[in-house]
Structure formats: C-alpha cells, structure tokens
C-alpha cells in the first residue's frame, strides 16, 4: 500500500513518476479519483496546501471531506486507534496536516489506507515535490543545480534534503540559524534575502519561498516582488503537484 509520509518513503522511480503525473495533469484532464472519498484533517492553519488539495481532488473527480481536528473526540476521551480505524471505514485516502509527526505515525498505523502528509513538524513532502517540479519546469532539469537555503532549519528543508538523493551533481548549501528560540528573530535577521544577496547569484538564478513570507524580515519586498522571484509560480504548482501525488496513490 502506498503512503507519502516522507520523501524517503519513495524510491527514485516513484518520485519521478509523481513529477511526470503532475506535468501530464497540468495540461490534460483525468478522473482517477472517481467515487473516492478523501478526508482532509488540518490541525494547523493552511491556505495553499488546503486549497490545492481541495481543488485538485475536485478536478480529479473525487470527493473531499473536511474533518475538523478540534471537533474530534481525540481532545476528550477517544483514542487515536479508534478514531482512525473508524475513519478507514468511510474514507479511501487521508490527507493529514499536524503539529506532531508522531500523530501522523499513529494515523498510518491505524488508518491502514493511503495517507498523505500535508505537513508535520519534521517533514513537508508535498512542498518539496512542488518545489522540485517548479525547479525542473524553470531549468529543464533538477540535476547540476546549486541550491542555497537561507533561514531557519524546518520541515521543508528536511524534505528537500531527502530529494537530493534523486539528483545528479546537485549541491545544497545551508545558511541557517541554530534555532535558538530565545533570540530567534534577531539571529534570523542575519539571513535575510535582499538585493545584496541576490546580486552575487547567477544571472539565471531564482528566488523561491513556500509562503507565507515575513516580508521585511525573511526577505525584502524588492526581492519577493522582483524579476527573479517565482513564488507565485511555485504556489500555483502546488495544485499540479498534489494532483500528481493523488494520481500516484490511485494506481
């Protein structure tokens, strides 16, 4: 049974299939989710991930059911085992966004049907797939790229680092804080992406951000609104990436 909890759950062939499915579904209509019910549980707030899954499921002719985490009896007396086993009686897939990866692992243990990690505290495979799709779309390949990560170490970075195993001669440099919570904002200000930083990059370089961005803190407005910024394309590609993932699960 297929699941997507982490990028490391995939082999290179599966990863490339998802990218190919995403590319195909960007230009043609398919209905692999006909008569399928997909539950969406979002413990954390979401704009791009939620909407891209909802629209993607609709476009693939599936049904999505929003399950409010705060309304589940998990907060009172019902166990994760009972909750997810019951959900598996009604749903075909589960898309789960959570504050704690351990909750995702419990869902995987008890739901016993395909699960997609829509973000946890240590992993964001959907974002990584979308980002790599965007890089491939922009450069024609994901091989032989120099990728620099600026800012805090987070779930997106951890997932992107796992993707490097599927590339050839791609180098990743990480310029990041050590995540000292006490002085985090002060420390991270040293890693702001601004015109000075972008001026030393290659002529064909691009700026990406998973959004939402703290403009004026993480990145200047000149950069995120500038010619090298492809953040809107990156956000748009969340839709085709989610569709590629969903099709991969369906076959």
Task: Please report, for each region that a protein language model flagged, where it lies by residue.
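Short, structured coil segments at secondary-structure junctions
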Residues: 60, 90, 110-112, 201-203, ...
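Glycine-rich phosphate/diphosphate-binding loop of Rossmann-like nucleotide-binding domains
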Residues: 43-55, 137-182
């Amino acid at each position: 049974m297929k699941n997507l909890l982490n990028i490391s759950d995939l082999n290179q062939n599966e990863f490339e299939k998802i990218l190919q499915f995403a590319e195909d579904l960007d230009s043609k209509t398919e209905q692999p989710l006909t008569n399928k019910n997909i539950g969406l549980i979002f413990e954390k707030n979401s704009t791009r991930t939620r909407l891209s899954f909802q629209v993607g499921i609709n476009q693939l002719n599936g049904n999505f059911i929003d399950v409010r985490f705060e309304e589940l009896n998990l907060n009172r007396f019902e166990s994760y085992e009972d909750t997810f086993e019951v959900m598996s009686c009604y749903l075909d897939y589960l898309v789960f966004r959570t504050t704690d990866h351990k909750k995702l692992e419990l869902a995987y243990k008890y739901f016993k049907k395909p699960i997609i990690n829509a973000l946890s505290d240590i992993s964001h495979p959907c974002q990584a797939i979308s980002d790599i799709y965007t890089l491939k779309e922009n450069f024609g390949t994901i091989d032989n790229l120099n990728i620099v990560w600026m800012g805090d170490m987070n779930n997106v970075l951890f997932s992107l680092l796992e993707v490097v195993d599927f590339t050839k001669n791609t180098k990743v440099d990480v310029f990041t804080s050590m995540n000292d919570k006490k002085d985090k904002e002060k420390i991270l200000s040293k890693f702001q992406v601004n015109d000075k930083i972008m001026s030393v990059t290659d002529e064909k370089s691009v700026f990406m951000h998973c959004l939402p961005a703290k403009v004026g803190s993480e990145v200047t407005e000149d950069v995120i609104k500038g010619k090298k910024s492809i953040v809107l394309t990156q956000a748009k590609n969340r839709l085709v990436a989610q569709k590629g993932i969903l099709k991969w699960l369906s076959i």
